[in-house]
Amino acid sequence: MYLLNNLALDLDAIFTQINLIYVLTACALAMSMGVFLAKKQARTFNEQGYAGADTATKGSENLPNVNFFEYGDMRFLHLGTPAVQGSMQISKPFDIHLEYVQRMMGWLLFADLNQVSHLQAMQMGLGAASLTKFCHMHLGMQTTAVELNPQVVAMCRLRFNLPQDNAKLQVIVGDAAEIAGQEKWRGKIDALQVDLSDQDAICPVLDSEAFYADCRQLLTANGCMTVNLFGRKANIDRSVQKIANAFGKDTLWSFKRTKAGNTILLAFRAPRTWDKNALLSQAQAIQVRWPLPAAKWLKVLAPVH
């Protein structure tokens, strides 16, 4: 009996190891297939001319490979490193589940909710397309996304439920810095969402006062830029100062830093004031309309002093 018990335990251990090897192998194959398909689609963009491309993708051959990983109901986007560049809940592909990405929608607290579908949104940095899909699918906004890496666009279309371009959705394969400086976009954007990082996700890749000044010029009179700041606190403080120099410090509101290390900053084209009761009513109205935890935002959002 002792030998049989030991044999059973050994067999369980062997089968556990086999299952683990099987899962890891399946994940590796899925990631490899994702890279292959994304590269193939990216080549199609470059060879045939991508309809949404307003600027050339310079040095695209040096951009990182794009892959994905699945765990349960979650799918994660990677740029060839362990750093997560975005994610999607497979059962709710058009919702936003990451806390810091939800906070990128904080501009809704200051918007006329009855007019949101008539506004224009722009995302600089596509990631897993969470913001782009939410603005397009849930809010019905005119939505433009700017992404440097054509493999990211291909992967989002293949694995992250990003719709094809249509009358209210455009994905531009190009440089966000160039787009920000283009005259055609000035004064047109109501909600500008900036989340730009490289494959290591250590700090924003575009973080100059000049870039933020160009971003300000894109906004309508009541427009708002939300930007994801991450990295060391000293670096975040420097970024806030650059944005303050470009926008004016009295236009800035900030969320407290998330546990994951993300600080979401709101920068308005012009200063905004709102009393606590009005913000609470607005947050409750947002929650009724859309799957966003807006009431929780009020506990961690305040003007920058």
Residue spans of the language-model regions?
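Short, strongly hydrophobic alpha-helical membrane anchors
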Residues: M1-Q17
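Structural signature of hydrophobic alpha-helical transmembrane segments
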Residues: N19-Y22
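N-terminal signal-anchor transmembrane alpha helix of single-pass membrane proteins
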Residues: L24-A38
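SAM/dcSAM-binding transferase cores
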Residues: A38, R43-E70, V84-S91, E99, ...
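The AdoMet/dcAdoMet-binding core of the Class I SAM-like
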Residues: G59, L77, F94-A221, A234
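Short, basic/glycine-rich phosphate-binding loops at helix/coil junctions
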Residues: G80-S87, L192
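A short, flexible beta-alpha/helix-coil linker loop
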Residues: A83-G86, S197-D200, M225
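C-terminal substrate-binding/active-site "lid" region of AdoMet-derived donor-dependent transferases
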Residues: E209-W274
